[in-house]
Design a protein with these regions (language model features):
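Extended hydrophobic/aromatic segments used for targeting, binding, or gating
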Residues: 268-302
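Active-site rim elements
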Residues: 52-55, 86-90, 172-173, 228-240, ...
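Substrate-binding/active-site clefts of carbohydrate-active enzymes
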Residues: 1-74, 79-105, 125, 170
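Alpha-helical packing segments of well-folded alpha/beta enzyme cores
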Residues: 58-69, 99, 238-249, 253, ...
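Conserved alpha/beta catalytic core and glycan-binding cleft of carbohydrate-active enzymes
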Residues: 74, 95-260, 264-265, 273-277, ...
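Catalytic cores of secreted or luminal carbohydrate-active enzymes
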Residues: 292-327
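Acidic, His- and aromatic-enriched active-site or binding-groove loops in soluble protein domains
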Residues: 21-35, 135-149, 279-284
Length: 328
């Protein structure tokens, strides 16, 4: 069990928001405030506030929480939302941040799986490949490269090969292994895999923000028509593209992360920001498995997973190393 934890902000929002968590206890200790205008919050998270990880109280809160989940609830590890925010000592992301030291020195937390979402929206917030050796990372470069390759984007072949073989350019220099790369194509944010091959544009009208919310550049390709279609050739092409993505993901070096429902074709009708939708749009519809095409896609996914599990060549412990061929 990997627990998704969000220690980078609270529900207060910006300075105009309600007092829900720590604002009424010690605003300056728990939140990053704008220097010289302490009524305002620094916002590295896109939520209106950022937790003050420079203060001992905030750090103690985080570490106590992590230890509790390991010792009492027996989780196997954590995925840290917007983890770059937790490493901001002054303004920049600091590889020597106190948070990293505390995690690495902790006899309990350091022994479980630690997975970073290695970015935030602040200055220089994209930190893929820069986390300490005991961490694994969501590999955003893998996602972007694989999406570009399968939509026919030129000049991606070389980088595609790097991502397929574990992204040694990102992780080998500090003695990390291929498993440090959490390979993914889709996640809870963004398109589902089926929507990735069915829509060129987001369709978030149901969110009530006039389709302004959510990522606009999705590196998607609808295979010829936007959204649902009765064209059998386009539907076949879309299913083939899904199989291309699944095979690439599950046979790449590194740790594959498959978003739930992608294995049988779950759709969000082109909505790539369903955090606010507690309805059929975001729910899992298990009855889809009664459909022939969905059951076939699940069967395909199982077969590819079986190939990965039965052949260690797809689960190397070390990066590939090139060398000259023998003359004989």
């Amino acid at each position: 069990v990997i627990l998704d934890v969000v220690y980078n902000h609270t529900a207060e929002g910006n300075h105009m928001g309600p007092t829900i968590a720590f604002r009424g206890i010690d605003n300056g200790a728990y939140y990053r405030l704008v220097e010289g205008d302490e009524a305002q919050y620094m916002d590295y998270t896109g939520t209106g506030n950022s937790l003050n990880v420079r203060h001992p109280h905030s750090l103690q809160l985080i570490m106590d929480s992590l230890r509790y989940w390991v010792t009492e609830m027996r989780v196997d590890g954590f995925r840290f939302d917007l983890a770059a925010t937790l490493a901001r000592e002054l303004d920049d992301v600091d590889k020597l941040a106190t948070f990293f030291d505390l995690v690495q020195q902790d006899p309990i937390v350091s022994q479980v799986k630690l997975i970073a979402e290695p970015w935030d929206i602040g200055h220089d917030g994209y930190q893929v490949g820069n986390f300490p050796p005991i961490w694994s990372e969501w590999n955003g470069k893998y996602r972007d490269t694989v999406r570009d390759f399968w939509r026919g984007e030129p000049a991606t072949l070389g980088e595609f090969a790097s991502r397929l073989t574990g992204s040694s350019d990102l992780y080998a220099d500090n003695d990390r292994r291929p498993t440090a790369s959490i390979n993914f194509i889709t996640a809870h944010d963004g398109f589902t895999l089926r929507d990735l091959v069915s829509y060129n544009d987001k369709h978030n009208e149901a969110n009530g923000e006039d389709n302004r919310d959510g990522e606009s550049f999705n590196r998607s390709w609808n295979c010829g028509e936007e959204g649902p279609t009765d064209n059998d050739e386009i539907r076949k092409l879309r299913r083939r593209q899904v199989r291309n993505f699944l095979t690439t993901l599950l046979l790449s070096q590194g740790t594959p992360m498959l978003s739930h429902g992608d294995e049988f074709g779950r759709t969000q009708d082109g909505n790539n920001n369903v955090y606010c939708q507690d309805n059929e749009l975001s729910w899992m519809d298990w009855s889809m498995l009664e459909e022939e095409k969905s059951a076939a896609m699940l069967g395909f996914t199982k077969r590819v997973l079986s190939i990965r599990n039965h052949h260690p060549v797809f689960r190397r412990k070390r990066f590939l190393a090139g060398g000259p061929l023998g003359s004989d």
